[in-house]
Amino acid sequence: MPTAPLYYLPQGFSVHIVANTGLRVVDNFCTAEEAEYLINKAREHLTRSKVILNNKAVDDSGRTSSHSVAFHRHHQDSHVLPIIARGAMLAGVPMDHAEQIYVSRYSDGEFYHGHYDFSDSFMSDHRLCTILIYLNDLDENQGGETYFRELNVAVRPKAGRAVIWTNMNPDGSKHLETAHAALPPRGEGTEKWVIQLWFRPYQMHPIREKLASLQVAEGIPLKGDEELPPGTWIPSKTAA
C-alpha cells in the first residue's frame, strides 16, 4: 500500500465523483509551480507522440501530439515525485508501480482519436488505473476536452485538475466504457499540456530518489462555477 503521507497533497485538494461513470475529477491535484516546471522542462525535449502496434511504438495519423519523458528508470526527476506519490495514494498502489511518465503537448488542431489505455500488447497491458493531469487552462472556445464517448462526458482542461479512472479489474476484465479521445485545442497559438500516470499491479521502476521535504505550497485555487458547453459536465461542488 502507499506510504506517502497526506502532507504531499496541495492545500485545496478535492475529489469529485462523476455520477454513474466510474470517473473521478480531482481539482488542485498539482500546484501552479509544479505545472509550470513540467511544461518548461518538457518543452525542451518534445518528440512526436506514438501509439503501440504489434508491441512497437509507431507514428499514427490518429495521434498528432508531441510528448517528452518526465520520469523513467534512468532519469528520476525529484520534482515529479510528489505527483507520483499523490497518484499512487489515490490508485491504492505503491509509487514504483507507475510506468514511465510523459508530458504531452497538443497544439492548435492536434488530437488523439478514441482509444483505450489498455491493450493486449505487453507495452500497455495490465494498466489498472489512469490519472490524466491538465497543466494549463483552456476556456470553452478553445476546446481540448477529454471526451468519453460511451459515458457522454467531456472534461475541460483546467490547470491542476486530474481525471482518474480504472481501466481493468484485478481479474483482468476490462472497462470498455473508458474509451476516450483528446479533442483538439482551437485557436492560433493555443496549447494543451497534460501529464499521464499509468499504474500497474506490479513494480515497474524502482524509485531511487527520495521525497525531498514537506510540501507546503498551496494548490491552484478553485474558481467557483463554470459555464460549460452543451453535453459537457464537470463536477464543481459535490465532493466525495
Segments (PLM) and residue ranges:
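Fe(II)/2-oxoglutarate oxygenase catalytic core
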Residues: 1-164, 168-240
